[in-house]
A protein has these predicted regions:
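An N-terminal, globular interaction/scaffold subdomain
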Residues: 40-92, 97, 112
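Redox- and metal-dependent alpha/beta enzyme cores, enriched for Fe-S-associated oxidoreductases
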Residues: 41-42, 47-59, 241-304, 308-313
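Acidic/glycine-enriched edge-of-secondary-structure segments
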Residues: 2-7, 63-80, 98, 202-210, ...
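A charged, amphipathic alpha-helical module
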Residues: 1-34, 142, 146, 150-274, ...
Length: 384
């Protein structure tokens, strides 16, 4: 990632996201800490923090091949689980002390089956995520979280009390608030941060101890006040999509003259735009309500598309967005349908929309540049 940002905290974020194993995880492990890998932002990582574990969001950063994992998946599975599983088969996830999967989609669901069959991780569980966002589904997920809570206590010999859960929720909410403050700076006419520079900040929060991340985030917010952004961008853009942890994708977009000022992705605002409710009596009930209903959902949740498009429009207005780019991993059926509906709604709202299909590991830069250039020209044409 090319950047002019001079900040020790920002450098730490970049180091934590440049690969899978990073200095922060190494230090945690050397001190005797345990690491819990997990797929999907609907897994309640507060539970791991309360158990004294380091939550680590699974990714395939640095992967160059799916040679080993191709035998584990069909030819219509997307490249995210392929690359992530390949890294595991190469031994790059041997530092994990456990893994929690979830039935967020059939592609990720297959990781659970293959992980159990081929890897020796002693604690591997799968959570059952409901399909809707109503009261019965909150009750269902409440039971799922309590089930996982009991399994963690038994396997790791820890006690996850309500008090420890509330402490974890408070810490995670404080981090969410700090992340929102980072995004606030992107509302200016000359944002001091590009989209490509913001992404490592967000991914780092899922790749290092939470207290350490909070401290670095506070330091960075002190540094960002000294940064000066450049103006004259062709358009203010928003990214909507799912599994996007690679800054290079945004770099290519921004090299064409646009600047990404906000997003609705599972490594972006959907993680932190709204907090867990700390006013209820039961911390598990608070988590169940948050992960099923309170936080902005993704296409995995049925019947919630009207709220999702309202959320996108709300952010687009707040950040003065000129156009929206929908990114989708090839073979992701959920986002394929979602982007079709999003495109229809945004056309009615007269907001330019471009859908870009991609592989998990960056490729096809020439085609990406051409399509983004044409999109920016369309936006500029609408102004004249």
């Amino acid at each position: 990632l090319e950047t002019k940002i001079k900040s020790e905290a920002f450098q730490k974020f970049c180091e934590a996201t440049a690969g899978i194993m990073n200095p922060e995880v190494e230090a945690w492990k050397q001190a005797g800490g345990k690491v819990m890998g997990y797929f999907c932002s609907t897994v309640p990582e507060e539970l791991f923090t309360a158990a004294g574990l380091l939550p680590f969001r699974m990714r395939g950063t640095g992967s160059t091949s799916t040679e080993l994992s191709d035998a584990c998946f069909s030819n219509i599975n997307c490249s995210y689980p392929r690359h992530t599983m390949n890294e595991a088969l190469l031994g790059n996830y041997d530092f994990l002390d456990g893994l929690v999967c979830i039935n967020s989609c059939d592609h990720v669901r297959r990781v659970y089956d293959n992980w159990i069959a081929q890897l020796g991780t002693t604690f591997v569980r799968v959570m059952s995520l409901p399909r809707k966002v109503e009261a019965p589904q909150i009750d269902w997920y409440y039971d799922e979280i309590n089930l996982l809570r009991g399994q963690l206590q038994e396997h790791f010999g820890v006690e996850i009390t309500d008090e420890r859960l509330w402490e974890a929720i408070k810490l995670h909410n404080e981090i969410r608030e700090l992340q929102k403050k980072v995004y606030e700076y992107r509302k200016s006419d000359a944002p001091p941060l590009s989209g490509a520079e913001t992404l490592p900040i967000m991914v780092a929060g899922l790749s290092m101890p939470k207290e350490r991340y909070k401290t670095l985030l506070q330091q960075f917010l002190g540094d960002i006040e000294k940064l000066k952004g450049g103006g004259g961008h062709r358009a203010r853009l928003m990214i909507v999509g799912g599994e996007l942890d690679d800054p290079e994708f945004m770099e290519v977009i921004e090299e064409q003259g646009g600047i990404v000022v906000t997003d609705s992705t599972c490594f972006g605002t959907r993680l932190m735009w709204r907090p867990v409710d700390e006013s209820v009596d039961d911390p598990v009930r608070a988590l169940a309500s948050y992960y099923i209903y309170d936080r902005p959902s993704c296409p995995r949740m049925y019947g919630d598309q009207p709220r999702r498009i309202d959320y996108i429009k709300e952010l687009a207005k707040e950040f003065r967005v000129d156009g929206i780019i929908g990114e989708r991993l090839i073979f992701c059926d959920q986002w394929l349908v979602e982007h079709y509906m999003t495109g229809m709604d945004l056309k009615e709202a007269e907001i330019p929309f471009l859908q870009l299909d991609r592989e998990y590991i960056m490729g096809g830069k020439g085609q990406l540049r051409t399509r983004v250039q044409a999109f920016l020209e369309t936006i500029e044409g609408m102004r004249s």
